[in-house]
A protein has these predicted regions:
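Short strand-turn-strand beta-turns centered on an Asx-Gly dipeptide
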Residues: 383, 407-410
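N-terminal core-entry segment
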Residues: 14-58, 62, 69-140
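C-terminal beta-strand-rich structural cap/linker in extracellular carbohydrate-active enzymes
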Residues: 419-448
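Beta-strand-rich binding/interaction modules
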Residues: 398-404
Length: 448
């Protein structure tokens, strides 16, 4: 890139890096005292207590980013979760100033805990952390969990007192992902019985798939799919999204989702349609559907990983195209420089990762799907004293397509890099070009 272009993009990057750190916030006095969710004063002894966890948003990229930029704080965040559980009988969902708002859904403290544990971060009590995860996931009275366990999904015709909007479909998918995270942590800890239980629960997303419509679809307590379903409608059954946008919320089992729809070719057609099926010109979109590319809504979190799913079916060049498009068009160095709500750092964390050339589709997998880098050189200085480097000497606004990849000087054909490669201080070098050249595993089916 020329110097002027690099300076401009550098300003945008620094802006997003700053924004990614606006939450969570320290929530204790200088002596460690803080007011807990049980309305009592507690003491953070030897650690810092944090609050303002917008976890439905930030588990996706912001918290994985913290594991590299500030792992010592991640340790204290997990300790904050454990303390919150001990004082409130469940992990935080969206806590603010020490109180639970229950503003969003899922039990997404779980993936943050699991990611930290699987990466070996900190000295938090893993037994206490896992127990808190399991207890929260088994709290039958909370937001449909009892029905989720009984039926394998949350029925749309049964509501609870937590939320006037049912969001049944979204809860089912979010719970399934969180259950996978519990299983991964339990497996690592040698607790196979817990792992088996939650791996089974993590497949509950399949119970909402309707092969007749090829979408996830709300079901009632008798097992019947809702009538009159339209995937581009925004309804009370789907959280801040429509059927197109939430269909892909199976980050833990993309291969299973591919099989569910009938194979890679069908999946490719559906994924391509996600970006090319545009809302009607007179459609009144909700305020959170911003940054639209077809049905893809970059202004809201459920879409954030979807761009990177082309890698899983051999269409890497489409991931590269759309990632570059979003970075160049939807992030700007101006007061209204985002296409949606910052959401406590998640919107910017997407950019911080993507500008480095990769993104955590599954935030607890230790794998980062390759997109397209933004700068000729980026370095990540790690707390273990090593430096992870990304090189793309000839990248510019036209040269957005990866022609070849090397890791530590050796040819590399995978569609992702790993946590271990990052922490080892590896050097990843991309040769960029202006025309697509698909890398990695390519299937032989007809392309849409």
């Amino acid at each position: 890139r020329d110097a002027q272009e690099s300076r401009g993009l550098g300003d945008v990057y620094k802006r997003q890096l700053y924004h990614s750190m606006i939450a969570p916030t320290i929530y204790n006095d200088v002596d460690g005292a803080y007011y807990g969710p049980d309305k009592k004063v507690h003491q953070a002894d030897g650690w810092v207590n944090y609050s303002t966890f917008s976890l439905w948003d930030t588990y996706r990229a912001a918290h994985p980013l913290f594991t590299y930029t500030e792992p010592e704080r991640v340790n204290d965040m997990i300790k904050s979760f454990i303390a919150f559980y001990e004082q409130n009988n469940r992990l935080p969902v969206w806590n603010f100033y020490g109180s639970e708002t229950d503003m969003m859904i899922g039990y997404h403290a779980v993936p943050v805990i699991a990611d930290a544990y699987l990466k070996g971060i900190g000295d938090f009590d893993a037994e206490k952390a896992l127990n808190a995860c399991v207890a929260t996931a088994n709290l039958d009275s909370y937001r449909g969990i009892g029905l989720y366990k009984e039926l394998g999904y949350i029925p749309y015709n049964v509501t609870d007192h937590y939320n006037a909007e049912n969001w049944s479909l979204s809860k089912t998918l979010e719970y399934a992902f969180d259950d996978y995270c519990i299983a991964e942590m339990a497996k690592k800890m040698g607790k196979q019985d817990i792992a088996d239980t939650f791996y089974k629960r993590s497949r509950n997303y399949r119970n909402l798939y309707n092969p007749e419509t090829s979408f996830m679809q709300p079901r009632d307590d008798k097992g019947r799919f809702i009538k009159g379903f339209k995937a581009d409608d925004y309804t009370p059954h789907i959280c801040e999204s429509n059927g197109w946008q939430y269909f892909w919320s199976v980050q833990h089992d993309i291969d299973g989702l591919i099989d569910l729809v009938g194979g890679k070719n069908r999946f490719a057609e559906k994924l391509d349609s996600m970006f090319t099926y545009h809302p009607a010109a007179d459609a009144e979109l909700p305020l959170f559907s911003t940054g639209m590319i077809g049905q893809y809504a970059h202004g809201n979190e459920p879409s954030h990983h979807v761009i990177y799913l082309f890698n899983s079916i051999g269409f890497n060049e489409r991931t590269q195209y759309y990632v570059a498009k979003v970075m160049n068009e939807l992030y700007k160095n101006e007061p209204a420089g985002l296409c949606g709500n910052e959401d406590c750092g998640q919107m910017s964390a997407w950019y911080v990762f993507s500008a480095m050339g990769f993104y955590p589709v599954n935030p607890v997998s230790g794998k980062y799907e390759i997109g397209t880098p933004l700068f000729p050189e980026m370095q990540l200085h790690l707390t273990n004293g090593k430096t992870f480097t990304v090189l793309a000497p000839n990248v510019n606004k036209k040269n957005i397509y990866i022609q070849s990849t090397k890791v530590n000087g050796h040819p590399y054909d995978k569609t992702y890099i790993t946590h271990e490669q990052i922490m080892s201080g590896a050097t990843v070098e991309f040769e960029m070009g202006s025309t697509p050249k698909t890398i990695g595993v390519i299937f032989e089916e007809k392309r849409p």
